[in-house]
Amino acid sequence: MDRPQPKPFPLAPVAASILAERETERRNHLRQLGYFKTACSEIDDYVLLGGLERGHVVGLSAEEESFAVAVLSRALLEPRQRALVITPKPAGVILRSLRDGVAAELAHEGVAPGDVEPRVRASLDCVMLSCVFDMDGLWEVLAELDRRGRASSPPGGRVPPSPASEIQDSEEDEGPSPPSPPADAPPSIILVTHFSSLLTSLFARRERPAAHANLSLLASRLRHLSRSLPSNPLVLILNSTTSSTDPHGPEPGRHPSAAAGSGKPLDPSLRSIFNPPPLPIPGYVPTSSRRNKPSFGLVFTQLLDLHLLASRIPRTAEDAEVALGSAALEARFVTVVEVLLDEMGLWTGRMGKRPNREQRWAAVQVDGGRVVDAFGKQKMAAVTEIRTSAGFGGRRP
């Protein structure tokens, strides 16, 4: 059943200066609340220039979901943070990844082994999980979340029950744990996993105009929730990727962004900086390139304020030769996280031009359940004295 079209109603005119003042106050408030970190300095400090902002809709197109799990794991270690995970897949896969991610972060922080398990249970208690099977299920969860947000606005109002069940690992075990947020608190992070599966089901069951209209309304609803809920949540949507050399990609007939093979050039906002446009040579086929791009292309991008792409590439030139050759050696890969689209720019607390993060990238890898810099930090040895021939030179007094 298609989403009902909203009926227009008269609105009183509002001066643009008032709207700008309200938006400035909102962005300053979000900046004071702080960013969500991935615990990887290359991504937080260089690529994102601080971290993931609250009150934004962020998309991650990746071959793996370790990056999103790292963001969620790190956020759950902060006090009074709650998360809502919406997934069309079995819950066990997400729970195992989340448990391992939280445990890895605690071990990295130096938490005693005996205190890791109670802290992991306390973190999982702050996660709500909703399993949906299609886009209608996603709409129901978001609608219930919106109703709870409106009910919590009046002072003294009673909040309805949560739309999703909380994860309870073990209610019998007791252990020290940090203070948990109230049970009726809205989530600080809304994570939607395997979004390409929901899009595939949507375009398979509905006509294309109706599907696009549904997604347009979904984009408005996601932005409304990220900006209107009291918690100003970060909405993180996980999307898959396709490549020109992937024989098991989504069905081209139902794929809105199937530009490969049709001669249509790829939109610049979807192209990785590591996948330049093919050479305009008649008959030239770049068989050695692996052109990774987000699934559903611009259809997915219309939902987002910030779009990240995570691609696996060979670690070194030697690994690239091994990957392209037929040798029995195993090539090493790293994951490159880059910003494809930064619709709003980074708010710095003042008017004027905002820093744009497009085409910023970092090479990372998963090490022990954590996302870390792939090449590490190299410390340069301090030169205390420079000697030259005949004793001349050296540090000046």
Where are these regions (language model features)?
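The Walker A/P-loop phosphate-binding site
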Residues: 1-126
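Fungal intrinsically disordered, low-complexity polar regions
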Residues: 1-24, 38, 153-185, 249-276, ...
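Amphipathic alpha-helical interface elements that mediate macromolecular binding in regulatory proteins
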Residues: 41, 70, 96, 125, ...
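Short amphipathic alpha-helical interaction elements and helix-loop-helix interfaces
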Residues: 49, 74-81, 104, 108, ...
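Hydrophobic/aromatic beta-strand patches that form the interior of the parallel beta-sheet core
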Residues: 58, 84-86, 128-130, 236, ...
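Conserved inter-motif catalytic segment of the P-loop NTP-binding fold
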Residues: 84-204
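Short helix/strand-bridging catalytic loops that position acidic/His residues to coordinate divalent metals
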Residues: 203-214
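Phosphate-binding/switch region of NTP-binding enzymes
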Residues: 213-216, 220, 224-388
